[in-house]
A protein has these predicted regions:
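Hydrophobic alpha-helical membrane segments
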Residues: 1-242
Length: 242
């Protein structure tokens, strides 16, 4: 039976009934960890503008520490989602189980590291092709980045952001088959990370574009909520949206 993306979303909302609190709790844990390390790394880079060897090494260590701390939470949240989808008892404590078991901790870190390396490899290829091709065709597009004219800089930055978006789309589409891997590890912690990646690629066959569609709808929903929240914030602050 073929199920539309919209029907799958309705099924998901039905399964979430009465479990929003535990789900939001798991997402909050992951968000707090992610924001904490992101803020730490950004603050460090802002106070160390000289990119010498020591600065780069420290930034890499912060990134590695971030991966080690957030990876178990990422797989743990998927475990929580799996409990909800399979109508099992869902508890926030299930997220922290991945920190208390050495084997789970290790495998979650290795899996998320492999996913990050796959994304990085795809990004290097596509960003290199897009930006290299753009520079070969029209080098003047990037000349404005070093200009003293603010309008030239703004125009060049717009070009850079547009090219980055163009490169990001194929990068994402290439790594899509490996995105469900954390769910597979969450369902069976005894699986090795490489096995999860291989099985993820096989499992998504025939459902590739449906998976992309689900993620796209979720992304658009987040943007819509953010837009509405910004309008409400402006109105409550006494601003005029017109």
């Amino acid at each position: 039976m073929k199920l539309s993306v919209f029907y799958l979303r309705r099924m998901g909302r039905a399964l979430m009934h009465g479990k929003y609190t535990v789900c939001l709790g798991g997402m909050t844990v992951l968000l707090v960890f992610s924001l904490a390390f992101s803020t730490l790394e950004q603050s460090f880079l802002n106070t160390n503008l000289d990119l010498d060897g020591k600065t780069i090494l420290t930034a890499l260590l912060i990134a590695v520490l971030s991966l080690a701390v957030t990876s178990p939470a990422q797989v743990g949240v998927r475990s929580l989602f799996g409990d909800i989808a399979n109508q099992r008892e869902a508890k926030l404590a299930h997220v922290f189980q991945w920190y208390g078991d050495g084997k789970r901790l290790n495998r979650s870190i290795v899996l998320m590291l492999l996913q990050s390396l796959l994304f990085l490899a795809a990004a290097v290829v596509f960003f290199g092709l897009v930006f290299g091709g753009a520079y070969a065709i029209h080098p003047e597009w990037f000349a404005g980045l070093t200009s003293n004219n603010i309008f030239a800089v703004a125009d060049a930055l717009t070009t850079v952001y547009t090219l980055a978006l163009v490169a990001l789309v194929p990068t994402y589409l290439v790594v899509v088959p490996f995105l469900p891997a954390p769910y597979l590890l969450a369902e069976d912690p005894e699986k090795k990370p490489l096995v999860c990646l291989r099985e993820s690629r096989r499992a998504i066959r025939g459902f590739y574009w449906k998976y992309v569609g689900l993620q796209l709808l979720s992304f658009l929903q987040v943007i819509a909520y953010a837009f509405l929240a910004s309008i409400v914030a402006v109105l409550f602050s006494g601003g005029d949206i017109t």
